[in-house]
A protein has these predicted regions:
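Hydrophobic alpha-helical transmembrane segments
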Residues: 1-181, 186, 194-330
Length: 330
């Protein structure tokens, strides 16, 4: 057990130091390729004259088949890699486990991608900011002003603190890289298939609901850790307001999980997030999160990243403490 804890810590350190260099093939991209492959073959009309209701049911079942196939493949390959590494020797196993843990986490990647938006806004203006933020959000960025670009970046940091950092960290702490990669597979399926349009309304529904389930508890743990981070993070954060806005606005989102950390971040920064947005040319009405006690500014991107990093360190410490306690008790 102690070497699993070492690999867990080493993976987190590697993530902080290296992040996700584009020249290194990332396992999540391979998972995405498998999802795309199955999507093209399963997400199509049944090929016969049937009612719309039956067609939608067929699409839903095919979406389930895709989800279980991706999960099984991810689980099996992860187990094979881990077992093969430890069968060589303990050192090889620990190294491979640490590298896999590193690939599961996205702490530095999230900071790097969001800081590109910050740098673009600060040095080149709103047009450059729109182009930069379009790489990390799904909304139409061409209609955003500087505040809108900043808001989109801060929302992405806040939401992905849970999805990209805390949730995979917790699952890896519980079940090692195998469970961590299974979580990443579910999250990737939701990102690729969880759209409410004609193509994915039924085909992607199972993946979207499964993602809601696996993120339900981690999102709430993330929120409370982020509240703690707001209290200890320094003068730029308002811990009391973070808790107040969390209690009030944590369900102001179509997803049961997304507003958990977004509400904390909005309260901690004393800004207003969310609200209406344009997706694929259509205006989508959304509730606001936060009171907007001050105007949002591009420096809030840096502050949101600081909040995310403190939250990640708190989760790492908590995870290691619990793993160590289990080791002592066993």
């Amino acid at each position: 057990m102690c070497y699993h804890i070492f690999a867990f810590i080493a993976g987190f350190v590697l993530d902080l130091l290296i992040g996700d260099p584009h020249f290194i093939p990332h396992p999540v991209r391979l998972i995405g390729s498998l999802i795309s492959f199955l999507d093209k073959r399963l997400n199509c009309d049944a090929g016969c004259n049937i009612s719309e209701k039956k067609l939608n049911l067929i699409k839903y079942k095919r979406g389930m088949r895709l989800a279980f196939t991706v999960i099984f493949a991810t689980f099996a390959i992860s187990v094979i890699i881990i077992v093969a590494a430890y069968s060589i020797n303990l050192y090889a196993g620990v190294i491979v486990e640490a590298v896999m843990t590193w690939q599961i986490l996205a702490t530095k990647c999230l900071r790097v991608e969001s800081m590109r938006v910050y740098d673009a806004l600060r040095t080149d203006g709103v047009d450059a900011g729109r182009r930069a933020v379009s790489m990390i959000v799904g909304r139409d960025t061409s209609v955003l002003d500087a505040a809108g670009v900043t808001r989109a970046a801060v929302e992405t940091i806040a939401e992905n603190t849970s999805d990209g950092v805390i949730a995979p960290m917790l699952y890896t702490a519980i079940g090692g890289p195998v469970l961590g990669f299974v979580y990443k597979a579910v999250n990737t399926m939701d990102s690729m298939l969880g759209y409410k349009n004609d193509k994915y309304m039924y085909f992607g529904r199972f993946a979207a609901r499964l993602d809601d389930v696996v993120n339900f508890i981690p999102a709430r743990i993330s929120a409370y850790l982020m509240i703690a981070a707001a209290f200890i993070g320094g003068r730029h954060f308002d811990g009391k307001n973070a808790y107040r806005i969390f209690k009030r606005d944590r369900f102001n989102h179509a997803s049961p999980n997304s507003a958990q950390t977004e509400s904390v971040c909005a309260g901690a920064l004393r800004v207003q997030l969310a609200g209406d947005a344009v997706y694929f040319g259509k205006l989508v009405k959304k509730k606001y999160i936060g009171d907007g006690l001050r105007e949002i500014e591009y420096e809030d991107i840096k502050r949101a990243n600081r909040l995310m990093y403190i939250t990640a360190f708190l989760c790492e410490l908590l995870s290691v403490a619990v793993m160590s306690l289990v080791l002592i008790l066993l």
